Each structure stands twice: as structure tokens, then as C-alpha cells.
Amino acid sequence: MSIKLNALFSDSYVDVSQYRDQHFKGNRYEQEKLLKQSATLYVGNLSFYTTEEQVHELFAKCGDVKRIIIGLDKIKKTACGFCFVEYYTRADAENAMRFVNGTRLDDRIIRTDWDAGFKEGRQYGRGKSGGQVRDEYRQDYDPARGGYGKMVQKS
């Protein structure tokens, strides 16, 4: 079967990435199934200062947004550079994956990925210092993400 025809038989025209949530409650098959049906996106590389309104303005261009959950530092309860965007339909979420991934928001190139669906508690960063793990060890200075990485600041 040709590559073009494969798209006709797939669940989605937007591929699911290799990333899997290590804290997912269930087996890999269940997670894959949810990812292929989901209307929820993970959005990463946001500035700590990006507002929910800015996220909504961008993502609403692709369809009706059900809700936005801003990721929070689990200790400080301040934004920590990611969010979840829920759409009412898979088709609208696919549009966002196609057209928003890799674009600029608040002077940062953002990335989107499928999410199996938001569950309470997932809005908190999983890093040791409360934020995102990727911000723990960052060597470069990034004012939009709190300066240097948390572990570098402690050295």
C-alpha cells in the first residue's frame, strides 16, 4: 500500500510522537489508544510569563477550545512553561498540531504533542525543585524561563 493511501486508513493525519507519559495509569496499549482519540494537546517551551489569554488567542484559530490548563510549579504555584489545551473535537486538535506546532508565541518557539487527556495533578511540574525537569539542568540563561537551570543556580 502506498504512503498516500495509508493516510486514508489511519486514525489521524497527524502522527503520535514517540514520547510517552511515564506516570500514565494503565498499559501502553491503553495509552496509545487514548492518544489516537484525544482532543487534548500538551504545549511546551512556553515563557513563564505567557498568559492563558495568549494561549487561547493562538489556539482558538484552529477550533473551539474547551479549556486551557496552565502548568504550575508545584511548590510556588506559578507558571512553569507548559500547558494543556483541550478542544471539543479531535479535528480541531489535529489542526492545531498541523498549524501551531513550531510557531512563535510570546517570542518563543512552542511545541505541541498529543496528550492522553488531562487528569487532576498533572498541571504541576515534576522537577525536584517544583518546575519542569528540563529546566532543572539547563546551562544557558533564559530570562523567559526563570534564568539559569535550578541545579546550576545551586552550584
From Swiss-Prot:
Record: residues binding mRNA: 19, 42, 111-115, 122-126, 132-133
Localization (cell): Nucleus; Cytoplasm
Gene Ontology terms: cellular component: cytoplasm; nuclear cap binding complex; nucleus
Gene3D superfamilies: 3.30.70.330
Keyword list, A-Z: Cytoplasm, mRNA processing, mRNA splicing, mRNA transport, Nonsense-mediated mRNA decay, Nucleus, RNA-binding, RNA-mediated gene silencing, Translation regulation, Transport
Subunit structure and binding partners: Component of the nuclear cap-binding complex (CBC), a heterodimer composed of ncbp1/cbp80 and ncbp2/cbp20 that interacts with m7GpppG-capped RNA.
Protein's UniProt name: Nuclear cap-binding protein subunit 2
Organism of this sequence: Danio rerio
Source organism phylogeny: Eukaryota, Metazoa, Chordata, Craniata, Vertebrata
The gene coding this protein: ncbp2
